């Protein structure tokens, strides 16, 4: 018989340096896939579900295949290239009720304009979720305005194997927030030095996002890299490598990857916060922010901006 700790899945995830890491998951992870589908994506047996992630990625496996199967859902599978008109047609024609996609796809749909969705009947949709990167507040507002539904962002990693923090269906969404930890998940914002880990206090301070180990879908190792795996755990916490803050009401907010933070004139600047501010401009369709080396400040903020149709760049 299969044991819950028997190896089941090997998901590869890119590292900031070196070759991709193979994260090992066990058969017992299916328990987390099942319950998080219910709690974070509001699965019901009669749902028609479409996850736009490719099955070669962890989302496409965990939530494009495994989780919906455990709930007996009808699933939409589409392998064609992205096309906004066809996507809206799929939502309409297949009567999709739960849609799980990525912030990049949402921004591409935003860029395509509001006329396309107005020409389709999207009344079957009752829940829209996003994952893979932070969802800017503008994306949440677009969902409410164009789809008639707010978009529920959530957070997890290849290493966590399943959704850890989410904007549940029944909770008030704070645009830009990844939500709150799921039941049974203990998350905190921490600082660590050597093996000492301390929880950040007060609320609102930035630090490393950490989870207490022990949930069923937690990865059990990196293929052939035991030392690298051990370094992820310190002081009774799994250190995710992401930076975050938590507000006084327990909502978590993504700041950036620890190795992506821009260090400028003694200040730590999260690219996502700058991107969110730029995205507020009505002419902006897409933006990416990096740190550019500077002899005085160490790094300065550099933004790459794509404009919406009908807008031209200028020196201003």
Regions inferred by a protein language model and the residue ranges of each:
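Active-site glycine-centered loops adjacent to acidic/histidine catalytic or metal-binding residues
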Residues: 132, 156, 179, 242, ...
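Conserved AMP-binding/adenylation subdomain of ANL enzymes
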Residues: 31-51, 55-98, 111-112, 116
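Conserved pre-ATP/AMP-binding loop-to-beta segment of ANL
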Residues: 1-12, 19, 42-48, 125
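Conserved AMP-binding A3 loop
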Residues: 8-32
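Gly/Ser/Thr-rich phosphate-binding loop
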Residues: 46, 70, 96-101, 110-174, ...
């Amino acid at each position: 018989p299969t044991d819950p700790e028997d190896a089941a899945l090997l998901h590869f995830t890119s590292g900031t340096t070196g070759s991709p890491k193979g994260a090992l998951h066990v058969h017992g992870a299916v328990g987390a896939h099942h319950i998080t589908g219910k709690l974070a994506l509001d699965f019901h047996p009669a749902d028609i579900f479409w996850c736009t992630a490719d099955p070669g990625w962890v989302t496409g496996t965990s939530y494009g295949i495994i989780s919906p199967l455990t709930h007996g859902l009808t699933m939409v599978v589409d392998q064609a290239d992205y096309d906004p008109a066809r996507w809206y047609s799929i939502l309409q024609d297949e009567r999709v009720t739960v849609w799980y996609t990525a912030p990049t796809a949402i921004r591409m749909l935003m860029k395509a304009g509001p006329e396309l969705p107005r020409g389709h009947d999207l009344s079957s949709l009752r829940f829209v979720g996003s994952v893979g990167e932070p969802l800017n507040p503008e994306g949440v507002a677009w969902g409410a305005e164009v789809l008639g539904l707010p978009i529920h962002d959530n957070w997890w990693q290849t290493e966590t194997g399943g959704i850890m923090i989410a904007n549940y269906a029944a909770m008030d969404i704070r645009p830009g927030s990844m939500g709150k930890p799921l039941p049974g998940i203990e998350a905190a914002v921490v600082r660590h030095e050597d093996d000492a880990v301390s929880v950040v206090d007060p609320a609102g301070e930035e630090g490393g996002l950490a989870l207490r180990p022990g949930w069923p879908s937690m990865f059990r190792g990196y293929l052939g890299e035991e030392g690298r795996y051990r370094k992820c755990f310190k002081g009774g916490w799994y250190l995710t490598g992401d930076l975050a803050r938590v507000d006084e009401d327990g909502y978590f907010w993504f700041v950036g990857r620890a190795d992506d933070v821009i260090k400028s004139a003694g200040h730590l600047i999260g690219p996502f916060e700058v991107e969110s501010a730029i995205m507020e401009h009505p002419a902006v369709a897409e933006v990416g922010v990096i740190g550019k080396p500077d002899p005085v400040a160490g790094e300065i903020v550099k933004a790459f901006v794509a404009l919406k149709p009908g807008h031209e760049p200028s020196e201003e």
